[in-house]
Regions:
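N-terminal pro-sequences and low-complexity stem/linker regions of secreted or lumenal proteins
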Residues: 1-517
């Protein structure tokens, strides 16, 4: 690697593909391509069969036309053959299906045609209940259609220094060589939309913009969602879990940050192979008519309500501390969960700075610092506004994790409050520990955005004292958004949001649809 281009028929890549590992270990497999098999229908694969780009599948590069890699990986096997294999109990243990351009839903192809193609696959599977009862159908998309994604994807920083680009857990550092590319060696790939904006040089790869993935099986029925971080290597990791055949080309950073899809299924429960009968909708009167854009347009709205959600392997917290003597503000990342997690941090005082990126492996911690903006001589000016923070850092993580730290350096003789978060994984509740290491008391208010009807908790925090503030999250299914403010310190804010995992099923975020949360 790296694999930038499509190398069909010649000069193919040479590293080992996963079908080769299946073949070596006696696991049956086949790639279906060539269209539906109906006379006159398209037979291309829109170059979406990446096996064609490897020399071991290319007859022109010396591969035998009768080899299993060629006959099963780059030869036409249509949906008609797929249907026959299912009906006759010949479906391989692992199958890949590649659609022609007309059915791939790439612009200008129609989503309606893509839905038809998917339906042909599903109808073939459910027509044989024995096969369907032991099948997982994974529907992948490889692009996001050019839509804007507000979530910064997980990506390792280029450097490993405090107060710089971010940090990665030490046990993941050895894997990072696979996550960087020297773009100066590939000048043709430097084609930014904005001329001159590509910095070149060594750059991280990361996960890229989010794309949909649907898991259809007897173990995933019911409209469930799973918000663990996944990427395209997660599909291979799922096959690893199923067949115990490891793919060594997946590095440890990817394995830490990206799950293996097993969290999305209920393999411990009773599978439900039943097929729901959905009535055919009425034909729209506007079918085949030009689309009319309304004069007054509006943003699309989130679907109301919640969905059942799978339990996730996360237990993530962040906490802060101030070092007035050194002029540093520290944030401690703690991951006590069973999976790694990626975070990014934004500096509200310097919004032009790119976000810092962090990767914290399971059962590990990281700490990073920011220079306090008011640690210099300007702190001595009496005219300095009361609402003038010295730090303003926001942290984003997986599954709605968010924390916000804002405030000013406490002056001598003033209160110095700090807040830490603790999860009760047995009950799904959360507890805040409020500590005041300053020499004066302060009035503290804690508000939960998921409990708008409540006035919040009003607390008096004495000097050199500690308080515990408990929140029952049963009404919000373990979701919380707690803001801590101090009456006489308007710049002070500690905000913690996310979900408390219990190992049991829950719901999707009930605050996503609300305009207030």
């Amino acid at each position: 690697g790296p694999g930038f281009g499509e190398r069909a028929k010649t000069n193919g890549y040479t590293w080992t593909t996963y079908p080769e590992r299946l073949e070596k270990n006696g696991v049956s497999w086949k790639l279906y391509q060539g269209g539906s098999g109906e006379p006159g229908s398209p037979t291309d694969n829109y170059t979406d069969n990446s096996l064609e780009f490897f020399s071991q599948y290319q007859v022109g590069e010396g591969a035998s036309p009768n080899s299993p890699l060629v006959t099963k990986g780059v030869t036409d096997h249509t949906l008609a053959e797929f249907r026959e294999d299912v009906a006759n109990n010949r479906l391989p243990e692992v199958s890949w299906i590649v659609a022609p351009y007309q059915y791939c839903e790439h612009p200008e192809a129609s989503p309606r045609d893509g839905a038809w193609y998917i339906n042909q696959i599903l109808e073939s599977l459910v027509a044989n209940p024995e096969v369907w009862s032991k099948t997982v159908f994974i529907l992948n998309y490889d692009e996001n259609d050019g839509l804007f994604d507000h979530v910064v994807p997980p990506m390792p920083p280029l450097t490993q220094q405090t107060n710089a680009q971010g940090l990665v857990s030490p046990d993941l550092l050895a894997a990072l060589d696979d996550e960087f590319i020297d773009m100066d060696q590939y000048p043709y790939e430097r084609r930014p939309l904005v001329p001159g904006s590509d910095p070149g040089g060594k750059q991280p790869i990361g996960l890229g913009a989010r794309v949909p993935l649907l898991l259809i099986s007897p173990w995933s029925t019911g409209g469930w969602v799973c918000s663990q971080t996944f990427d395209h290597t997660s599909v291979l990791q799922f096959l690893e879990a199923r067949f115990d055949i490891r793919e060594p080309n997946i590095n440890q950073w990817r394995r830490s940050i990206c799950g293996d899809l097993t969290a999305a299924f209920d393999f411990a429960g009773t599978p439900n192979p039943a097929i729901e009968k959905i009535p055919v909708p009425a034909v729209l009167a506007s079918l085949h008519q030009p689309y009319s854009v309304p004069d007054v347009q509006s943003m699309p709205q989130q679907e109301p309500g919640t969905r059942p959600a799978r339990a996730l392997p996360y237990s993530l917290t962040t906490s802060s501390r101030i070092e007035p003597a050194t002029g540093r503000f520290w944030i401690d990342f703690e991951n006590s969960g069973k999976a790694g997690a990626a975070f990014y941090a934004r500096n509200g005082i310097l919004p032009q700075e790119p976000p810092r990126r962090y990767s914290v492996s399971a059962a590990n911690t990281l700490s990073d610092c920011w220079l306090l903006s008011g640690s210099g001589p300007d702190r001595k000016h009496a005219s300095r506004p009361r609402f003038d923070p010295d730090y303003d850092i926001s942290i984003h993580g997986p599954n709605g994790f968010f924390s916000h730290f804002r405030g000013a350096i406490p002056a001598p003789g003033q209160p110095h409050p700090e807040v830490t978060v603790h999860y009760n994984h047995a009950t799904g509740d959360v507890q805040l520990t409020l500590a005041n290491t300053g020499n004066a008391p302060c009035a503290v208010k804690v508000v939960n955005a998921y409990a708008k009807s409540e006035v919040g908790h009003q607390l008096q925090l004495e000097a050199h004292a500690t308080l515990e503030d408990h929140w029952n999250l049963g009404a919000s299914s373990g979701w919380f958004d707690l803001s801590v403010t101090v009456t006489d310190a308007p710049a002070f804010l500690r905000r913690f949001a996310g979900h408390v995992e219990t190992g049991r099923a829950s719901t999707s975020d009930p605050g996503v649809f609300s305009e207030e949360v």
